[in-house]
Swiss-Prot record:
EC number in record: 7.1.2.2
Gene: atpA
Recorded family membership: Belongs to the ATPase alpha/beta chains family.
NCBIfam families: atpA, PRK13343.1
Organism listed in the record: Streptococcus mutans serotype c (strain ATCC 700610 / UA159)
Binding site for ATP: G169, D170, R171, Q172, T173, G174, K175, T176
Coiled coil: none
Subunit architecture: F-type ATPases have 2 components, CF(1) - the catalytic core - and CF(0) - the membrane proton channel. CF(1) has five subunits: alpha(3), beta(3), gamma(1), delta(1), epsilon(1). CF(0) has three main subunits: a(1), b(2) and c(9-12). The alpha and beta chains form an alternating ring which encloses part of the gamma chain. CF(1) is attached to CF(0) by a central stalk formed by the gamma and epsilon chains, while a peripheral stalk is formed by the delta and b chains.
Keywords tagged on the record: ATP synthesis, ATP-binding, Cell membrane, CF(1), Hydrogen ion transport, Ion transport, Membrane, Nucleotide-binding, Translocase, Transport
Catalysed reactions listed for this entry: ATP + H2O + 4 H(+)(in) = ADP + phosphate + 5 H(+)(out)
Function summary: Produces ATP from ADP in the presence of a proton gradient across the membrane. The alpha chain is a regulatory subunit.
InterPro entries the record matches: ATP_synth_asu-like_sf, ATP_synth_asu_C, ATP_synth_asu_C_sf, ATP_synth_F1_a_nt-bd_dom, ATP_synth_F1_asu, ATPase_F1/V1/A1_a/bsu_N, ATPase_F1/V1/A1_a/bsu_N_sf, ATPase_F1/V1/A1_a/bsu_nucl-bd
Protein name: ATP synthase subunit alpha
UniProt membrane topology term: Peripheral membrane protein
Amino acid sequence: MAINAQEISALIKKQIENFQPNFDVTETGVVTYIGDGIARACGLDNAMSGELLEFDNGTFGMAQNLESSDIGIIILGDFNSIREGDTVKRTGKIMEVPVGQSLIGRVVNPLGQPVDGLGEIETTATRPVEAAAPGVMQRQSVSEPLQTGIKAIDALVPIGRGQRELVIGDRQTGKTSIAIDAIINQKGQDMICIYVAIGQKESTVRSQVEVLRKYGALDYTIVVTASASQPSPLLYIAPYAGVAMAEEFMYNGKHALIVYDDLSKQAVAYRELSLLLRRPPGREAYPGDVFYLHSRLLERSAKLSDELGGGSITALPFIETQAGDISAYIATNVISITDGQIFLQENLFNSGIRPAIDAGSSVSRVGGSAQIKAMKKVAGTLRLDLASYRELEAFTQFGSDLDSATQAKLNRGRRTVEVLKQGLHKPLAVEKQVLILYALTHGFLDSVPVDDILTFQDDMFDYIDSHDADIFETIRTTKDLPEEAVLDKAIQTFKDQSQFS
């Protein structure tokens, strides 16, 4: 058999031309230190800040400190099986979390992995956890109301869609209850809710999930949990993961409400990471960029311009104070970033005034422009009335005789405090809030005993529902009050027929 050199040469050339080199080039480094959710590695000279890195066991980390000799990495998961000397490689990616409709009704960790035992989440869409906030021209002013269903908030410190309203107070003063009630009240309001639980007990998170399920709120809610037993890197990224999920809805023209419960624990987790990474400590041992930690998170909440779809993210960040000190470092930082604060006081809570909102220290800087006309009319003087009542109440403790005008103010003040009380998980529709506040400010409650105010309120709602339902319908559709004569007649007719006449 003759061997044709030209044929062999052509065959070899063809194979060389068709040769596909099957190898990957990856930049790897070596772990030099591991512990407390932190790793240090050398050899990754080209790693970028915030880049995802992969360890031998499949766990991911995020590059934080880029130094000349090595890099500091926070580990996003179990670090117990990582050893000194293990290899770590670059991925060339930044951290992203799954987003989209399929997350609604689920409980996930900050990596977007389900922890509710209901199977995998079917979604291919992702968003980066760190993203730039909308610019000045991409926003519009807050103009639509977000009804929390809580009389004291919707009347005194109204919240608008796209606002950041801080909820601040000591532990066990009802902060989480306000958030859960606000979420429950979003039923039928075309709002997606995201509840981010940071550093809470897993049993507490479970009970909150069950409350949401009981009231049907889980149908439009995503729960992101980084419990107290999780490594601090997960507590640090949990709020960013939550807002990334919310941004998917906002940029698609929808409205989202996100609750951060609470950012004090995130700041503590970030302080822990920073100290372990040997960053220089500042005031209260927090790192110098702790303000930026929260500002870049809360600035991602916005009301987008109509050109971008008009979607919004409304944020309710929580801060826990010690002994009512709202001048602490983290508290003042977040107060300066947000558009107002709701201050909860322990002494009000313990005296049975719940929600324990201190009207004097609470403020909403932009929510007033989002309040509906009807509420503006009935709640206009409410804050002033409460402030003068508190002042007079302190004065009466000296036991001096009071003239009839002062006594009338005190009586009205006591009834105002009573009207603003509300049961747990009983949010009220805005038209019902308007009606009871109208009855209060127009003197219909002045002759009702203080202890019977809430009974009077419930009975009045039932009566108006069955006899004058068009009053509620008018407020709901026009956002304004019906004719005063119609309201006066309906309330007076109920009062004459009731036990309070």
